[in-house]
């Protein structure tokens, strides 16, 4: 099968090695939530990114692509509650641990699906928003922005969901 051949021949690394030293093309991956199997929209999104990265490799660019996963947030909490976890009957720490375990299991599932779809990326070094290194980089970036005077305090509405007992992201409040 083609996938096994690509893995055996380390196809992705061979492409990178071939273009080492050439101008880089970096596509930053806006990550999907790790809250279940890939759905059609996420599969299409990742396939388009794969097409863009590969086409730039064919043009001679060095094209490292690090897939990412968002492992925080309400979609993951909702997914494990649908599996029967009652967040009110366990501690916050236990609920968060269950969310983290679930998210990591979904990353593995989604990663394997992407590989079966023929996508290539550095699956050995994905970025995952729950990784301490990732969280640390976010804090350092925020600190640098604050030192440059880019952070300010102001007023804006916070849309609260009494059903979910959490604030919703702006894009969720349409």
Placement of each model-derived feature along the sequence:
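N-terminal, positively charged nucleic-acid-binding surface of large information/translation enzymes
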Residues: 1-174
């Amino acid at each position: 099968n083609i996938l096994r051949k690509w893995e055996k021949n380390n196809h992705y690394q061979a492409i990178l090695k071939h273009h080492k030293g050439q101008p880089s093309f970096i596509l930053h991956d806006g990550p999907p939530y790790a809250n279940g199997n890939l759905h059609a929209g996420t599969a299409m999104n990742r396939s388009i990114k794969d097409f863009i990265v590969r086409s730039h490799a064919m043009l001679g660019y060095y094209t490292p692509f690090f897939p990412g996963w968002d492992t925080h947030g309400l979609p993951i909490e909702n997914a494990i509650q649908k599996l029967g976890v009652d967040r009110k009957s366990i501690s916050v720490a236990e609920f968060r641990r269950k969310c983290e375990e679930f998210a990591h299991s979904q990353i593995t599932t989604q990663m394997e699906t992407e590989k079966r779809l023929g996508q290539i990326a550095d699956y050995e070094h994905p970025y995952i928003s729950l990784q301490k290194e990732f969280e640390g980089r976010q804090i350092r970036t925020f600190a640098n922005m604050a030192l440059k005077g880019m952070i300010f305090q102001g007023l804006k509405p916070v849309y609260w969901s009494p059903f979910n007992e959490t604030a919703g992201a702006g894009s969720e409040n349409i």
